[in-house]
């Protein structure tokens, strides 16, 4: 262990502007000052020793004049002083003065004040000198019988530490602590004693647990947690003990402490794969999610449930708990609800889908009754998508779901209404038996639709699937109702002119008597010349869309009118009725064309919309069989092809996902019989407690051995040259929210380098946690220095700096070696993610930062280039493989990723292969990146620029 890594128990801030006191003045204050002066002097002595000063002349002064004082502040400071002061001579022998200190320790261990006793015992845990501890052992033992629990629990800790470091001083410690544990009543004392037995003498700990296994539920939560840890470790090391302790774990699932329940459930899952055990653990997790108020806890426990689901055998057990899992939806947090719905959808089966749909329908109705909120709208979207997926997987449920969801087509939130419309479109195409019901409900809500986008979709569905005369007539009636009085231009001009006519003045509310200051009545008019503005008038929806200049809906309406008119002609034999219906449809199109080229709309009609409406007029005037087939057959086939491709893509992704799951046991694996297995072979699973401890300490072992390129050596950055007096290289270890730089510093000179300091600075969203300590390097010596850097976002970060040092015996200024810059790889923080096309488009429209990267590569194949970019940026391609397959000379794809900080990154790849330049021509085009923050967009662009120049492998 290097000097920089030595454990430091006490950190004291030193004011930089204060002048260090002299040893003489300190000695004078310690000898002759009052208690306050001695306290201040002792503080200064402690700070100076921490800064490297020796001050050997003050040791005896402190023993003579400060140690006998009974002031509690002095006693606290003395504990710090004795911890840091050198206690041995250079040759390792104990200083003679420490015998006097040892006597003071003994007196403090017998002090009537329990705080002084307890803090002294805690201090003894830090002592590494057996000669100091040996005379104190009787006093430490006596503290086990003190009346106050604070003293007893610290006595246990002291005995445990001394036994671990110097077993010969107290060889009977396990037996002593076992006897203490049997008679002890205080929970914290029992916890410390039991913890010691676990690590010092596990057999005694098990014996004690066996005697009180039925009373475990009555213990305090801190002791219960230690018991869970012991059972896990014992059963992990010796699986034959599982039957002995599994009942205890079952009992601890009923503990009043959430932490104990969580640990017990996790332990139960690792100890047993029996359905009853899995069900009990899952039920415990669900209760924790519902009862805990902290959303982070809910998400962590939900992840444990999702992990359980990944196991095929456990998945069947969890399917019976779907309704219990849905109770979690009572949580208002959107992320928790999202994970819960996804989990429920993964677990739903034909046995419980009906109950699931009932619950989700109730939740949808609830969202309509609560006050509008951004999360409410998003939650409604999640519910709609879940019901959509249920209906596709279980067609029998669609009839129950459709009537409830179609009410939301008139919702003011366009995103939720769009999800409903997408579901209705798929349902009406897939389920022939539901078409009448859907058309009927669509006609009911048609007039109330507020969004033009939803209106267009509803028009398309009605035009495509109205197959009876009555339905077709109903559609025409609804369109006329939604369009209002025609011709539109004339009626609008009349309204404009009517606003200026005095005779059309309208009466306002009841007249009140108004009295002036003079006491006379004021004159009032019962008429008002002001009329409501256009925006205040209640316009029919379609008329409103057209007057606002949105003529794309008019083109959609023209197509719908053409479809239903052609269908009406085929259904009705009477020529007069045929002509009447077709003429009405053509009149509506003509009046819309007239409106588009006149002044009332805010924006004129576009040429594309004019062409579309004119084409529909021409089709209706001719009524050819070819046009009839195109409008009434091929349009529907296009939708059918799209839905089939979508379903196939979903099945393919599900298949890939299932293939990713690691197979626990291969068919040809040998069967392991427990009785025939050597004890050391049973530890097949990793110790979860050890893994969590390593993760907390930042020492998580990554599985890098399988990939040689992912080894630590691949992440070593050279910071200086081989010819520099100090050579340095760094290993950049990236954790989730911080970076650890492990810097190797080598003195390549024949001089001793003093105060060798690594000075670092950061650029970007990085923050240096602490300044590395100075070192002294002998000739040709080396040392490791560690520096922690906090990361707050995925912005590209740079760490730069230098190494400064003094040469021993030289009179020159400090020497400096400038280090190479360390660039932090953004890819360590970006993870592939998925989202729907609608979400992608919405984010693309919302995100304001765009970075356009020009393709500059020597890769000649479009698909190879796309795969190279995906690998380099760690993004996921959202465009289906079928859409990318084949060769046509150009390619467009959407990519998506999320950072661990919750930032979204979108990219659109638009590339082509210039045919005129021959088969060996490189790919050209550009990549557009969008993100909410500038840092993400620029960082991802830089990464693509760096990586695309590499040759495709």
Swiss-Prot record:
Keywords recorded for this protein, A-Z: Acetylation, Cell membrane, Cytoplasm, Cytoplasmic vesicle, ER-Golgi transport, Golgi apparatus, Membrane, Protein transport, Repeat, Transport
Main localization (coarse): cytoplasm
In-chain residues carrying the UniProt-annotated modification N6-acetyllysine: 494
Location of N-acetylthreonine modifications: 2
Compartments in which it is found: Cytoplasm; Golgi apparatus membrane; Cytoplasmic vesicle, COPI-coated vesicle membrane; Cell membrane
Cytoplasm recorded as keyword: yes
Any single biological process term in GO: endoplasmic reticulum to Golgi vesicle-mediated transport
Protein name in UniProt: Coatomer subunit beta
Species this protein is from: Sus scrofa (Pig)
């Amino acid at each position: 262990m290097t000097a920089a890594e030595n454990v430091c128990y006490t950190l004291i801030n030193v004011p930089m502007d204060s002048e260090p006191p002299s040893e003489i003045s300190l000695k004078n204050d310690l000898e002759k000052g009052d208690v306050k002066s001695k306290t201040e002097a002792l503080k200064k002595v402690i700070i100076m020793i921490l800064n490297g000063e020796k001050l050997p002349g003050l040791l005896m002064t402190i023993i003579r004049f400060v140690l006998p004082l009974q002031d509690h502040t002095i006693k606290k400071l003395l504990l710090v002083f004795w911890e840091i002061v050198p206690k041995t001579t250079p040759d390792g022998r104990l200083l003679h003065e420490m015998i006097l200190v040892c006597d003071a320790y003994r007196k403090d261990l017998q002090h009537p004040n329990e705080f002084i006793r307890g803090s002294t015992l805690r201090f003894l845990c830090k002592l590494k000198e057996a000669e100091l501890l040996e005379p104190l052992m009787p006093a430490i033992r006596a503290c086990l019988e003190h009346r106050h629990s604070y003293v007893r629990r610290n006595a246990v800790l002291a005995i445990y530490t001394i036994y671990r470091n110097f077993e010969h001083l107290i060889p009977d410690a396990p037996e002593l602590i076992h006897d203490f544990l049997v008679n002890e009543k205080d929970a914290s004392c029992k916890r410390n004693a039991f913890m010691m037995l676990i690590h010092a003498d596990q057999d005694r700990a098990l014996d004690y647990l066996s005697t009180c296994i039925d009373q475990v539920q009555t213990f305090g939560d801190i002791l219960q947690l230690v018991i869970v840890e012991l059972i896990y470790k014992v059963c992990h090391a010796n699986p034959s003990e599982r039957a002995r302790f599994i009942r205890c774990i079952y009992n601890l699932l009923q503990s009043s402490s959430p932490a104990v329940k969580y640990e017990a459930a996790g332990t139960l899952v690792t100890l047993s794969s029996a359905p009853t055990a899995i069900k009990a653990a899952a039920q415990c997790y669900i209760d924790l999610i519902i009862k805990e108020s902290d959303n982070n806890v809910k998400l962590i426990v939900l992840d444990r449930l999702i992990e359980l689901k990944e196991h095929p055998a456990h998945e069947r057990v969890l399917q019976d708990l779907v309704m219990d899992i849905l109770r979690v939806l009572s949580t208002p947090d959107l992320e928790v609800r999202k994970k819960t719905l996804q989990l429920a959808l993964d677990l739903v089966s034909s046995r419980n889908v009906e109950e699931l749909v009932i619950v989700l329908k109730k939740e949808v109705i609830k969202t309509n009754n609560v006050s509008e909120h951004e999360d409410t709208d998003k939650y409604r979207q999640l519910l709609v998508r879940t019901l959509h997926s249920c209906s596709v997987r279980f067609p029998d449920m669609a009839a129950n779901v459709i009537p409830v969801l179609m009410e939301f087509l008139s919702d003011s939130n366009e995103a939720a209404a769009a999800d409903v419309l997408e579901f209705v479109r798929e349902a009406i195409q897939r389920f022939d038996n539901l078409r009448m019901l859907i058309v009927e409900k669509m006609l009911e809500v048609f007039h109330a639709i507020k969004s033009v986008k939803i209106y267009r979709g509803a028009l398309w569905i009605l035009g495509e699937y109205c197959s009876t005369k009555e339905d077709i007539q109903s559609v025409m009636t609804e369109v006329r109702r939604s369009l209002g009085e025609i011709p539109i231009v004339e009626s609008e001009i009349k309204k404009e002119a009517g606003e200026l006519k005095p005779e059309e003045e309208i009466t306002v509310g009841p007249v009140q008597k108004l009295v002036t200051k003079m006491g006379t009545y004021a004159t009032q008019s019962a008429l008002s010349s002001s009329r409501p503005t256009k925006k205040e008038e209640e316009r029919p929806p379609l008329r409103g869309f057209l007057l606002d200049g949105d003529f794309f809906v008019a083109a959609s309406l023209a197509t719908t009118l053409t479809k239903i008119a052609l269908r009406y002609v085929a259904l009705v034999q009477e020529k007069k009725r045929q002509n009447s219906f077709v003429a009405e449809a053509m009149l509506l199109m003509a009046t819309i064309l007239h409106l588009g080229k006149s002044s009332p709309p805010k924006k004129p009609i576009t040429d594309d919309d004019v062409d579309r409406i004119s084409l529909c007029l021409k089709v209706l005037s001719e009524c050819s069989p070819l046009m009839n087939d195109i409008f009434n057959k091929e349009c529907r086939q296009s939708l059918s092809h799209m839905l089939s491709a979508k379903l196939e893509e979903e099945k393919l992704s599900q298949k890939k996902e299932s293939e990713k799951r690691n197979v626990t046991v291969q068919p040809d694996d040998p069967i392991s019989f427990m009785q025939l297995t050597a004890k050391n072979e049973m530890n097949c699973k990793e110790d979860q407690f050890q893994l969590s401890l390593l993760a907390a300490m930042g020492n998580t072992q990554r599985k890098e051995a399988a990939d040689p390129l992912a080894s630590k050596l691949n992440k070593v950055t050279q910071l200086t040259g081989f010819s520099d007096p100090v050579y340095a290289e760094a290993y950049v270890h990236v954790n989730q929210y911080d970076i650890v730089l492990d810097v190797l510093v080598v003195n390549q000179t024949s001089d001793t380098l003093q105060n060798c300091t690594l000075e670092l600075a950061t650029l970007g969203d990085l923050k240096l946690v602490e300044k590395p300590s100075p070192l002294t390097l002998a000739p040709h010596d080396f040392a490791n220095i560690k520096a922690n850097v906090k990361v707050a976002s995925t912005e590209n970060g740079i760490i730069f700096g230098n190494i400064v040092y003094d040469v021993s015996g030289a009179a020159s200024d400090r020497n400096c070696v400038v280090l190479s810059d360390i660039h932090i790889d953004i890819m360590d923080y970006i993870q592939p993610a998925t989202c729907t096309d609608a979400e992608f488009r919405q984010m693309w429209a919302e995100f304001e930062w765009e970075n356009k990267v020009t393709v500059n590569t020597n890769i000649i194949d479009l698909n190879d280039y796309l795969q190279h970019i995906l690998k380099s940026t760690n993004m996921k391609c959202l465009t289906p493989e079928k859409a990318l397959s084949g060769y046509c000379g150009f390619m467009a794809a959407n990519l998506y990723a999320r950072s661990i900080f919750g930032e979204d990154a979108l990219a659109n790849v638009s590339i082509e292969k210039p045919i005129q330049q021959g088969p060996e021509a490189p790919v050209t085009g550009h990549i557009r990146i969008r993100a909410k923050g500038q840092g993400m967009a620029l960082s991802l662009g830089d990464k693509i620029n760096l990586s695309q120049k590499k040759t495709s492998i």
